[in-house]
Amino acid sequence: MKSGRFIGVMSGTSLDGVDVVLATIDEHRVAQLASLSWPIPVSLKQAVLDICQGQQLTLSQFGQLDTQLGRLFADAVNALLKEQNLQARDIVAIGCHGQTVWHEPTGVAPHTLQIGDNNQIVARTGITVVGDFRRRDIALGGQGAPLVPAFHHALLAHPTERRMVLNIGGIANLSLLIPGQPVGGYDTGPGNMLMDAWIWRQAGKPYDKDAEWARAGKVILPLLQNMLSDPYFSQPAPKSTGREYFNYGWLERHLRHFPGVDPRDVQATLAELTAVTISEQVLLSGGCERLMVCGGGSRNPLLMARLAALLPGTEVTTTDAVGISGDDMEALAFAWLAWRTLAGLPGNLPSVTGASQETVLGAIFPANL
Protein backbone atom coordinates (compact mmCIF):
# COMPACT_ATOMS: atom_id res chain seq x y z
CA MET A 1 0.00 0.00 0.00
CA LYS A 2 1.61 3.24 -1.16
CA SER A 3 1.99 5.95 1.44
CA GLY A 4 3.95 9.16 1.63
CA ARG A 5 3.51 12.69 0.34
CA PHE A 6 0.54 13.38 -1.93
CA ILE A 7 -0.68 16.58 -3.54
CA GLY A 8 -4.35 17.45 -4.04
CA VAL A 9 -5.49 19.95 -6.67
CA MET A 10 -8.99 21.43 -6.68
CA SER A 11 -10.63 24.08 -8.83
CA GLY A 12 -14.25 24.29 -7.78
CA THR A 13 -17.43 25.75 -9.18
CA SER A 14 -16.70 29.09 -7.48
CA LEU A 15 -13.66 29.57 -9.75
CA ASP A 16 -12.00 31.61 -7.01
CA GLY A 17 -8.59 29.98 -7.51
CA VAL A 18 -6.77 26.67 -7.74
CA ASP A 19 -6.31 25.13 -4.29
CA VAL A 20 -3.20 22.96 -3.91
CA VAL A 21 -2.48 20.94 -0.77
CA LEU A 22 0.51 18.85 0.30
CA ALA A 23 -0.15 16.04 2.77
CA THR A 24 1.34 12.87 4.18
CA ILE A 25 -1.17 10.04 3.82
CA ASP A 26 -1.22 6.42 4.95
CA GLU A 27 -3.84 3.96 6.20
CA HIS A 28 -3.83 5.55 9.66
CA ARG A 29 -3.78 9.30 9.11
CA VAL A 30 -3.90 12.31 6.82
CA ALA A 31 -1.53 15.09 7.87
CA GLN A 32 -1.62 18.36 5.96
CA LEU A 33 1.83 19.87 5.49
CA ALA A 34 1.31 22.94 3.31
CA SER A 35 -1.06 24.62 0.90
CA LEU A 36 -1.42 27.51 -1.49
CA SER A 37 -4.07 29.16 -3.63
CA TRP A 38 -3.09 29.85 -7.23
CA PRO A 39 -4.94 32.54 -9.22
CA ILE A 40 -7.02 31.73 -12.30
CA PRO A 41 -6.50 34.29 -15.10
CA VAL A 42 -9.64 36.28 -15.85
CA SER A 43 -9.69 35.08 -19.47
CA LEU A 44 -9.66 31.43 -18.39
CA LYS A 45 -12.30 32.03 -15.73
CA GLN A 46 -14.59 33.67 -18.29
CA ALA A 47 -14.05 30.85 -20.78
CA VAL A 48 -15.08 28.29 -18.15
CA LEU A 49 -18.12 30.36 -17.14
CA ASP A 50 -19.18 30.61 -20.78
CA ILE A 51 -19.05 26.87 -21.41
CA CYS A 52 -20.80 26.13 -18.10
CA GLN A 53 -23.71 28.31 -19.18
CA GLY A 54 -24.12 26.59 -22.53
CA GLN A 55 -22.11 28.83 -24.84
CA GLN A 56 -20.99 26.88 -27.88
CA LEU A 57 -17.28 26.36 -28.53
CA THR A 58 -15.47 24.89 -31.49
CA LEU A 59 -13.57 21.67 -30.82
CA SER A 60 -10.37 23.68 -31.26
CA GLN A 61 -11.41 26.18 -28.58
CA PHE A 62 -12.44 23.36 -26.24
CA GLY A 63 -9.12 21.58 -26.75
CA GLN A 64 -7.19 24.76 -26.08
CA LEU A 65 -9.11 25.34 -22.84
CA ASP A 66 -8.39 21.76 -21.73
CA THR A 67 -4.66 22.27 -22.36
CA GLN A 68 -4.54 25.71 -20.74
CA LEU A 69 -6.20 24.44 -17.57
CA GLY A 70 -3.83 21.47 -17.40
CA ARG A 71 -0.88 23.84 -17.64
CA LEU A 72 -2.41 26.09 -14.97
CA PHE A 73 -2.78 23.15 -12.58
CA ALA A 74 0.83 22.12 -13.25
CA ASP A 75 2.06 25.66 -12.57
CA ALA A 76 0.20 25.63 -9.25
CA VAL A 77 1.78 22.31 -8.24
CA ASN A 78 5.26 23.46 -9.23
CA ALA A 79 4.81 26.65 -7.21
CA LEU A 80 4.01 24.60 -4.11
CA LEU A 81 6.99 22.29 -4.72
CA LYS A 82 9.31 25.28 -5.05
CA GLU A 83 7.90 26.89 -1.91
CA GLN A 84 8.49 23.67 0.06
CA ASN A 85 11.91 22.89 -1.50
CA LEU A 86 10.66 19.55 -2.81
CA GLN A 87 11.38 17.61 -5.99
CA ALA A 88 9.08 15.45 -8.10
CA ARG A 89 10.67 12.32 -6.62
CA ASP A 90 9.45 13.40 -3.16
CA ILE A 91 5.78 13.07 -4.18
CA VAL A 92 3.92 9.78 -4.65
CA ALA A 93 1.12 11.23 -6.77
CA ILE A 94 -1.13 14.18 -7.48
CA GLY A 95 -4.90 13.84 -7.12
CA CYS A 96 -6.42 16.35 -9.54
CA HIS A 97 -10.17 16.88 -9.66
CA GLY A 98 -10.10 19.01 -12.81
CA GLN A 99 -12.50 21.82 -13.66
CA THR A 100 -16.14 20.77 -13.93
CA VAL A 101 -17.74 22.31 -17.02
CA TRP A 102 -20.86 20.15 -17.19
CA HIS A 103 -22.61 17.75 -14.81
CA GLU A 104 -25.68 15.85 -16.00
CA PRO A 105 -25.94 12.61 -13.99
CA THR A 106 -29.48 11.71 -15.06
CA GLY A 107 -31.23 11.13 -18.37
CA VAL A 108 -30.68 8.80 -21.32
CA ALA A 109 -26.88 9.11 -21.25
CA PRO A 110 -25.73 10.39 -17.83
CA HIS A 111 -22.38 12.16 -17.88
CA THR A 112 -20.05 14.56 -16.13
CA LEU A 113 -17.13 16.45 -17.63
CA GLN A 114 -14.04 17.74 -15.84
CA ILE A 115 -11.29 19.26 -17.98
CA GLY A 116 -7.66 20.22 -17.45
CA ASP A 117 -5.44 17.75 -19.31
CA ASN A 118 -3.77 15.45 -16.80
CA ASN A 119 -1.10 14.59 -19.39
CA GLN A 120 0.02 18.22 -19.26
CA ILE A 121 0.34 17.98 -15.49
CA VAL A 122 2.46 14.83 -15.68
CA ALA A 123 4.68 16.27 -18.40
CA ARG A 124 5.25 19.55 -16.57
CA THR A 125 5.71 18.19 -13.03
CA GLY A 126 7.18 14.73 -13.57
CA ILE A 127 4.70 13.33 -11.03
CA THR A 128 2.09 10.60 -11.47
CA VAL A 129 -1.44 12.02 -11.61
CA VAL A 130 -4.73 10.42 -10.62
CA GLY A 131 -7.71 12.17 -12.22
CA ASP A 132 -11.15 11.67 -13.78
CA PHE A 133 -12.61 10.63 -10.43
CA ARG A 134 -16.34 10.96 -11.09
CA ARG A 135 -17.20 9.02 -14.23
CA ARG A 136 -16.78 5.47 -12.86
CA ASP A 137 -19.44 6.17 -10.26
CA ILE A 138 -21.78 7.49 -12.97
CA ALA A 139 -21.08 4.40 -15.08
CA LEU A 140 -22.35 2.35 -12.12
CA GLY A 141 -25.60 4.32 -11.92
CA GLY A 142 -24.47 6.92 -9.39
CA GLN A 143 -24.51 10.69 -9.39
CA GLY A 144 -20.72 10.93 -9.53
CA ALA A 145 -21.07 13.39 -6.65
CA PRO A 146 -20.55 14.28 -3.96
CA LEU A 147 -17.36 12.27 -3.41
CA VAL A 148 -16.02 14.19 -0.40
CA PRO A 149 -18.42 12.63 2.20
CA ALA A 150 -16.22 9.51 2.27
CA PHE A 151 -13.29 11.70 3.30
CA HIS A 152 -15.40 13.59 5.83
CA HIS A 153 -16.41 10.27 7.37
CA ALA A 154 -12.80 9.06 7.57
CA LEU A 155 -11.63 12.22 9.33
CA LEU A 156 -14.58 13.71 11.20
CA ALA A 157 -17.10 11.02 12.14
CA HIS A 158 -17.78 10.60 15.88
CA PRO A 159 -18.98 7.40 17.60
CA THR A 160 -21.82 9.09 19.50
CA GLU A 161 -22.28 12.67 18.27
CA ARG A 162 -24.61 13.40 15.34
CA ARG A 163 -22.44 15.42 12.99
CA MET A 164 -22.82 16.94 9.55
CA VAL A 165 -20.18 18.57 7.40
CA LEU A 166 -21.26 21.39 5.12
CA ASN A 167 -19.08 22.50 2.24
CA ILE A 168 -20.16 25.88 0.86
CA GLY A 169 -18.38 26.34 -2.44
CA GLY A 170 -20.15 27.40 -5.61
CA ILE A 171 -22.58 24.61 -4.81
CA ALA A 172 -23.33 23.64 -1.19
CA ASN A 173 -23.10 19.98 -0.24
CA LEU A 174 -23.87 18.19 2.98
CA SER A 175 -22.26 15.09 4.50
CA LEU A 176 -24.36 13.20 7.05
CA LEU A 177 -22.22 11.51 9.71
CA ILE A 178 -24.85 9.94 11.94
CA PRO A 179 -23.76 7.14 14.32
CA GLY A 180 -25.26 3.78 13.41
CA GLN A 181 -26.39 4.91 9.95
CA PRO A 182 -24.80 4.70 6.49
CA VAL A 183 -22.96 7.85 5.47
CA GLY A 184 -25.23 10.21 3.53
CA GLY A 185 -24.54 13.24 1.40
CA TYR A 186 -25.83 15.33 -1.46
CA ASP A 187 -25.82 18.80 -2.99
CA THR A 188 -28.35 21.06 -1.27
CA GLY A 189 -28.28 23.67 -4.07
CA PRO A 190 -26.45 26.95 -4.66
CA GLY A 191 -23.76 27.93 -2.20
CA ASN A 192 -21.77 31.01 -3.22
CA MET A 193 -22.47 30.66 -6.94
CA LEU A 194 -25.49 32.92 -7.35
CA MET A 195 -24.24 35.48 -4.84
CA ASP A 196 -20.91 35.71 -6.68
CA ALA A 197 -22.56 35.89 -10.10
CA TRP A 198 -24.86 38.71 -9.00
CA ILE A 199 -22.24 40.97 -7.43
CA TRP A 200 -19.88 40.32 -10.36
CA ARG A 201 -22.53 41.54 -12.83
CA GLN A 202 -23.72 44.44 -10.68
CA ALA A 203 -20.52 45.76 -9.10
CA GLY A 204 -17.61 44.03 -10.85
CA LYS A 205 -16.53 42.31 -7.64
CA PRO A 206 -15.63 38.59 -7.54
CA TYR A 207 -17.54 38.06 -4.29
CA ASP A 208 -19.37 39.93 -1.53
CA LYS A 209 -16.53 40.49 0.94
CA ASP A 210 -17.75 40.09 4.54
CA ALA A 211 -21.31 40.06 3.13
CA GLU A 212 -21.23 43.87 3.02
CA TRP A 213 -23.70 44.13 0.15
CA ALA A 214 -26.05 41.48 1.51
CA ARG A 215 -26.08 43.02 4.98
CA ALA A 216 -26.94 46.41 3.45
CA GLY A 217 -30.01 44.92 1.77
CA LYS A 218 -33.30 43.38 2.82
CA VAL A 219 -34.64 39.97 1.87
CA ILE A 220 -37.33 40.15 -0.82
CA LEU A 221 -39.69 37.47 0.50
CA PRO A 222 -41.76 36.99 -2.69
CA LEU A 223 -38.53 36.53 -4.70
CA LEU A 224 -37.22 34.09 -2.11
CA GLN A 225 -40.42 32.03 -2.25
CA ASN A 226 -40.31 32.09 -6.04
CA MET A 227 -36.78 30.69 -6.06
CA LEU A 228 -37.57 28.12 -3.36
CA SER A 229 -40.26 26.68 -5.64
CA ASP A 230 -37.57 25.24 -7.93
CA PRO A 231 -38.12 21.46 -8.09
CA TYR A 232 -34.48 20.68 -7.28
CA PHE A 233 -34.98 21.67 -3.65
CA SER A 234 -37.76 19.11 -3.07
CA GLN A 235 -36.04 16.35 -5.06
CA PRO A 236 -35.03 13.41 -2.83
CA ALA A 237 -31.42 12.26 -2.45
CA PRO A 238 -29.24 11.06 -4.05
CA LYS A 239 -28.93 14.27 -6.03
CA SER A 240 -26.22 16.58 -7.33
CA THR A 241 -26.15 19.76 -9.35
CA GLY A 242 -23.82 22.44 -10.71
CA ARG A 243 -23.34 25.65 -12.62
CA GLU A 244 -25.05 24.23 -15.70
CA TYR A 245 -28.30 24.46 -13.67
CA PHE A 246 -27.89 27.15 -10.99
CA ASN A 247 -26.36 29.98 -13.03
CA TYR A 248 -26.99 33.62 -13.86
CA GLY A 249 -29.62 32.63 -16.40
CA TRP A 250 -31.54 30.80 -13.65
CA LEU A 251 -31.44 33.96 -11.52
CA GLU A 252 -32.54 36.19 -14.42
CA ARG A 253 -35.60 34.03 -15.03
CA HIS A 254 -36.72 34.56 -11.44
CA LEU A 255 -35.92 38.28 -11.46
CA ARG A 256 -38.16 38.93 -14.49
CA HIS A 257 -41.11 39.05 -12.11
CA PHE A 258 -39.38 41.65 -9.90
CA PRO A 259 -38.23 44.61 -12.04
CA GLY A 260 -36.48 47.59 -10.48
CA VAL A 261 -35.38 45.90 -7.25
CA ASP A 262 -32.40 47.21 -5.29
CA PRO A 263 -29.32 45.09 -6.19
CA ARG A 264 -28.39 44.87 -2.50
CA ASP A 265 -31.80 43.43 -1.71
CA VAL A 266 -31.21 40.74 -4.34
CA GLN A 267 -27.83 39.99 -2.73
CA ALA A 268 -29.50 39.63 0.68
CA THR A 269 -32.16 37.36 -0.82
CA LEU A 270 -29.57 35.10 -2.45
CA ALA A 271 -27.71 34.75 0.85
CA GLU A 272 -30.99 33.81 2.52
CA LEU A 273 -31.72 31.29 -0.26
CA THR A 274 -28.45 29.51 0.47
CA ALA A 275 -29.03 29.55 4.24
CA VAL A 276 -32.65 28.38 4.03
CA THR A 277 -32.04 25.55 1.54
CA ILE A 278 -29.15 24.25 3.64
CA SER A 279 -30.98 24.46 6.98
CA GLU A 280 -34.10 22.81 5.56
CA GLN A 281 -32.03 19.85 4.38
CA VAL A 282 -30.26 19.56 7.74
CA LEU A 283 -33.63 19.38 9.49
CA LEU A 284 -35.16 17.00 6.93
CA SER A 285 -32.19 14.69 7.50
CA GLY A 286 -32.97 14.50 11.21
CA GLY A 287 -30.82 17.37 12.44
CA CYS A 288 -27.42 17.20 14.08
CA GLU A 289 -25.60 18.25 17.21
CA ARG A 290 -22.70 19.81 15.33
CA LEU A 291 -22.58 21.32 11.84
CA MET A 292 -18.99 21.83 10.68
CA VAL A 293 -18.69 24.25 7.77
CA CYS A 294 -15.88 24.47 5.22
CA GLY A 295 -15.35 26.15 1.85
CA GLY A 296 -15.45 29.83 0.96
CA GLY A 297 -18.91 30.27 2.45
CA SER A 298 -17.55 29.52 5.91
CA ARG A 299 -15.96 33.00 5.79
CA ASN A 300 -19.30 34.70 5.07
CA PRO A 301 -20.41 36.11 8.45
CA LEU A 302 -24.02 36.58 7.35
CA LEU A 303 -24.36 32.99 6.12
CA MET A 304 -22.85 31.60 9.31
CA ALA A 305 -25.12 33.76 11.47
CA ARG A 306 -28.23 32.78 9.52
CA LEU A 307 -27.38 29.08 9.72
CA ALA A 308 -26.98 29.36 13.49
CA ALA A 309 -30.33 31.19 13.75
CA LEU A 310 -32.16 28.70 11.52
CA LEU A 311 -30.71 25.70 13.38
CA PRO A 312 -31.28 26.33 17.11
CA GLY A 313 -29.77 23.62 19.24
CA THR A 314 -27.04 22.90 16.67
CA GLU A 315 -23.46 24.01 17.23
CA VAL A 316 -22.49 25.70 13.96
CA THR A 317 -18.73 25.96 13.63
CA THR A 318 -16.01 25.68 10.99
CA THR A 319 -13.81 22.68 10.33
CA ASP A 320 -10.87 24.90 11.33
CA ALA A 321 -12.14 24.49 14.90
CA VAL A 322 -11.33 20.77 14.68
CA GLY A 323 -7.96 21.31 13.03
CA ILE A 324 -8.79 21.02 9.32
CA SER A 325 -8.55 24.11 7.14
CA GLY A 326 -11.91 24.82 5.56
CA ASP A 327 -10.22 26.39 2.54
CA ASP A 328 -8.20 23.24 1.84
CA MET A 329 -10.75 20.52 2.61
CA GLU A 330 -11.67 19.57 -0.96
CA ALA A 331 -8.11 19.59 -2.30
CA LEU A 332 -7.08 17.44 0.67
CA ALA A 333 -9.93 15.06 -0.11
CA PHE A 334 -8.69 14.50 -3.66
CA ALA A 335 -5.16 13.84 -2.42
CA TRP A 336 -6.74 11.18 -0.17
CA LEU A 337 -8.81 9.78 -3.05
CA ALA A 338 -5.61 9.51 -5.14
CA TRP A 339 -4.04 7.51 -2.31
CA ARG A 340 -7.06 5.20 -2.23
CA THR A 341 -6.93 4.67 -5.99
CA LEU A 342 -3.24 3.72 -5.91
CA ALA A 343 -3.96 1.44 -2.95
CA GLY A 344 -6.76 -0.29 -4.89
CA LEU A 345 -9.40 0.89 -2.41
CA PRO A 346 -12.90 2.14 -3.29
CA GLY A 347 -13.45 5.88 -3.19
CA ASN A 348 -17.20 6.23 -3.60
CA LEU A 349 -20.03 5.56 -1.17
CA PRO A 350 -23.15 4.07 -2.81
CA SER A 351 -25.22 5.34 0.13
CA VAL A 352 -24.25 8.85 -1.00
CA THR A 353 -24.09 8.70 -4.79
CA GLY A 354 -26.62 5.96 -5.51
CA ALA A 355 -24.10 3.83 -7.43
CA SER A 356 -24.78 0.09 -7.63
CA GLN A 357 -21.52 -0.77 -5.85
CA GLU A 358 -18.32 0.54 -4.34
CA THR A 359 -15.50 1.00 -6.84
CA VAL A 360 -11.95 2.24 -7.23
CA LEU A 361 -12.19 5.71 -8.76
CA GLY A 362 -10.18 7.57 -11.34
CA ALA A 363 -7.61 7.05 -14.04
CA ILE A 364 -3.86 6.88 -13.41
CA PHE A 365 -1.46 8.89 -15.58
CA PRO A 366 1.98 7.48 -14.67
CA ALA A 367 5.08 9.65 -14.71
CA ASN A 368 7.39 6.67 -15.21
CA LEU A 369 6.82 3.10 -16.36
From Swiss-Prot:
MF terms in GO: ATP binding; kinase activity; phosphotransferase activity, alcohol group as acceptor
InterPro entries found in the cross-reference section: Anhydro_N_Ac-Mur_kinase (IPR005338), ATPase_NBD (IPR043129)
Catalyzed reactions: 1,6-anhydro-N-acetyl-beta-muramate + ATP + H2O = N-acetyl-D-muramate 6-phosphate + ADP + H(+)
Top-level division of the source organism's lineage: Bacteria
Pathways per UniProt: Amino-sugar metabolism; 1,6-anhydro-N-acetylmuramate degradation; Cell wall biogenesis; peptidoglycan recycling
Signal peptide interval: none
Keywords, alphabetical: ATP-binding, Carbohydrate metabolism, Kinase, Nucleotide-binding, Transferase
EC number: 2.7.1.170
Annotated binding of ATP, by residue: 12-19
Pfam family, one: AnmK
Gene Ontology BP term (one): peptidoglycan turnover
Recorded family membership: Belongs to the anhydro-N-acetylmuramic acid kinase family.
Job of this protein: Catalyzes the specific phosphorylation of 1,6-anhydro-N-acetylmuramic acid (anhMurNAc) with the simultaneous cleavage of the 1,6-anhydro ring, generating MurNAc-6-P. Is required for the utilization of anhMurNAc either imported from the medium or derived from its own cell wall murein, and thus plays a role in cell wall recycling.
Name this polypeptide is given: Anhydro-N-acetylmuramic acid kinase
Source species of the chain: Escherichia coli (strain SMS-3-5 / SECEC)
Gene this protein is translated from: anmK
